[in-house]
Amino acid sequence: MELEPGSGEERNRWQQTSLLSLVAPAQLCDGTAEKAVEATDGAATPSTPSHQPPPPARLLILDTETTGLDPLKHRCIEVGAVLFDVPQRAVLSQISFLLPCQTNEAETVNGIAAAVTRLSQPWPEALAYFQTLVAASDLILAHNAGFDRQWFGHGPLPAIEKPWLCSMEDLRWPPDRNLRANPSVRDLALAYGVPVWAAHRALTDCIYLAQVLERCDDLEGLLCAGLEPRQLYRARLPYEERHRARQAGFRWNDPVPKAWSRRLSAREAAAIGFPVSLEQLSA
């Protein structure tokens, strides 16, 4: 589930899951992980990347709907997925299914009544087919992947061992689309001329994202850039220039207290246009 940034306290809470646990898969698009080196002026200097292997050929675009924020207290009640072929820009298969729950505290957000999830339906068979789609993919792509990923390995959902990529935080959409940093699925779809007819159901958001990818001229380059290893950086700007950090997609107080921070590759950090430094979060 991805909710629009900046549209209320509850929506902001849904996006505050840290993506630091997402490890970019070096074997797909990066032969040797880049290492960020902090220069004396606070800027980062990237090492020279080695030869890059081909980008992933098969993506599983994935989204979830849940009863709350915490996988230890709440449940995933809907999974949507689209198997997407990158070279052909084509949807190969798609699935959506509900998982039964007793109550849904987020019904006002996703519109899924708990009673509907308990209606007779072949969700175990659907879950089994979903696992075949996972097996057929090279990479899992999700909008706000840090949120979606945490539900797998809880309840009936198996853990997913494939690499993950976040279309909200890790992909740098072309400047000519006039998107803000970390765009919502809705804004992303509209920027690519995809009609938006519904929101907050799992398969709907997957379809939006698949149609965006169909329209990407350099999807392979976009994916490879997104898979570059990333680390957490803090913006080193005076208070009166804080707008520069915000415009560059840095977040205030999340996850670094009282600081503007964002996950960047070493190449991005060197080109950001203002001083940044590597940040280590305490356990």
Located regions from the model:
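Conserved beta-strand -> loop -> alpha-helix junction used to position metal-binding or nucleic-acid-contacting
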Residues: I160-W173
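Acidic two-metal-ion nuclease catalytic site recognized across multiple nuclease folds
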Residues: E2-S50, V212-A283
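Conserved non-catalytic scaffold segment of RNase H-like nuclease domains
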Residues: R11-K162, N178, N182-H200, A248
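Short Asp/Glu-rich motifs
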Residues: A126, Y208-L209, L264
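Acidic, divalent-metal-coordinating active-site segment for phosphoryl/phosphodiester hydrolysis
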Residues: R201-E214
